[in-house]
C-alpha cells in the first residue's frame, strides 16, 4: 500500500518542533540539500522608489526580560543554534537574532520573542 500525501501531511503535522528539526536535518543529509532560504533578486531599475522601500530586515534582541529561558528557547527554534550559542546571544544583547529576513518573517519572529518576554527591534 502506497503512502498518500495526506498521510504524510498528517504525520508531519503531529510532530513536535524538535522532531521536525530532526526531520529537516535528516532530509538535508540524505538528499544533500539545504533548508536555508534562497534570496531572490528583485527587478532591476526600479529607481528611487525601490531604494526607499526596505525588503530585508534584521531582528535585534535588545533585552531578554524576566523570562530568559523562554527567550533562549525561541532563539534556538528560530536560528537552529545550540543551547550555549543561543544563551550567549541572549546574554550578549543587544545582538542580531536574524539578518536579511522578509518583513513578514521579521514581524513573526518579533512577536514570538516578545511573547516570550524579550525586548525586540526590527531594523
Swiss-Prot record:
GO cellular component assignments: cytosolic large ribosomal subunit
Keyword check for Ribonucleoprotein: yes
Gene Ontology MF terms: mRNA binding; structural constituent of ribosome
InterPro entries hit by this protein: Ribosomal_bL12, Ribosomal_bL12_C, Ribosomal_bL12_C/ClpS-like, Ribosomal_bL12_oligo, Ribosomal_bL12_oligo_N_sf
One of the protein's GO biological processes: translation
This protein's UniProt keywords: Ribonucleoprotein, Ribosomal protein
The keyword Glycoprotein belongs to this UniProt entry's keyword annotation: no
Main function: Forms part of the ribosomal stalk which helps the ribosome interact with GTP-bound translation factors. Is thus essential for accurate translation.
Oligomeric and partner information: Homodimer. Part of the ribosomal stalk of the 50S ribosomal subunit. Forms a multimeric L10(L12)X complex, where L10 forms an elongated spine to which 2 to 4 L12 dimers bind in a sequential fashion. Binds GTP-bound translation factors.
Family to which this protein belongs: Belongs to the bacterial ribosomal protein bL12 family.
Record protein name field: Large ribosomal subunit protein bL12
Protein source organism: Dechloromonas aromatica (strain RCB)
Gene behind the chain: rplL
Amino acid at each position: 500500500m502506497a503512502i498518500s500525501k495526506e498521510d504524510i501531511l498528517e504525520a508531519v503535522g503531529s510532530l513536535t518542533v524538535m522532531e521536525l528539526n530532526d526531520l529537516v536535518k535528516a532530509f538535508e543529509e540524505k538528499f544533500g540539500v539545504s533548508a536555508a532560504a534562497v534570496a531572490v533578486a528583485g527587478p532591476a531599475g526600479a529607481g528611487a522608489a525601490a531604494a526607499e522601500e526596505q525588503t530585508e530586515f534584521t531582528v535585534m534582541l535588545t533585552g531578554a526580560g524576566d523570562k530568559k529561558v523562554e527567550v533562549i528557547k525561541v532563539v534556538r527554534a528560530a536560528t537552529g543554534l545550540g543551547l550555549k550559542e543561543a544563551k550567549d546571544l541572549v546574554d550578549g544583547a543587544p545582538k542580531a537574532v536574524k539578518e536579511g529576513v522578509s518583513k513578514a518573517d521579521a514581524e513573526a519572529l518579533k512577536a514570538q520573542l516578545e511573547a516570550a518576554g524579550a525586548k525586540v527591534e526590527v531594523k
